[in-house]
Amino acid sequence: AAGMATDVLVPTHWNSSIDGGWLEKLRKKGSTIHRLDGLHGMVHLRPQLRPKQVAVVPKIAVRRLDGDGVHDAGEILEIPESILEGIEQTQADEGRYAGDAWEFASMISMHDGVISQSVTVASEAVLMGVPTLLVSNAERGFLDRLESDGFPLFRLRSDEVVEEIHAQFLAGLHLTEVLDLPDWPNARQQFAEFIGSELID
């Protein structure tokens, strides 16, 4: 598909230093590169109501991956058992989540926090204001943007001290009531204009 693309839409935070030359190859083939200010979650998500006070035993949604995805090799880290102690867990594991997939984002928003191996779930959770501990070596431009924009994302990588990052995450849970989320750019409108569509809501 990349060889046939006339137009390519990437976010403004696209990091060409980690894309293996993909974007430059498309540009050299004559594709027109368009930039969207925002993350993909800003196109399909809406900020949701979330708990303002953390439960005495924090309610945490935990997302584990199967690990057979195209990007998973070298990125997925085991979630340390120590960070799962003292919480009420909702299992949201890939391929084993028992709830309604269409209500997944709403389910996440009703928790005090998220612990995830999935960069997608982590990004969507923090966009909704849910403090999230991402356990992964993944490097993505959108993760850097979420951090720099002030969303409640905590990243545990293989070279980090588990106890330090875990302590930061726990402290972040208790700042939820004073968390002032950044305004979202109007990514939905930008995307609608790009595809020549009109928003109906």
List PLM regions with ranges:
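Catalytic donor nucleotide-activated moiety binding site of glycosyltransferases and closely related
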Residues: V62-R64, E78-A101
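Catalytic binding pocket for nucleotide-activated donors in carbohydrate/polymer assembly enzymes
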Residues: L127-T176
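Structural loop-to-beta junction motif characteristic of Rossmann-like glycosyltransferase folds
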Residues: T6, G113, G129-L133
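A nucleotide-sugar donor-handling region in carbohydrate enzymes
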Residues: T6-G74
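C-terminal amphipathic helix plus adjacent low-complexity
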Residues: A171-D201
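Short acidic-hydrophobic, aromatic-tinged amphipathic segments that line or gate anion-handling sites
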Residues: I33-D37, Y97-G99, P152-V162
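Donor nucleotide-activated moiety binding/catalytic core segment of transferases
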Residues: D93-V121
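A conserved, positively charged/aromatic
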Residues: A1-V10, I108
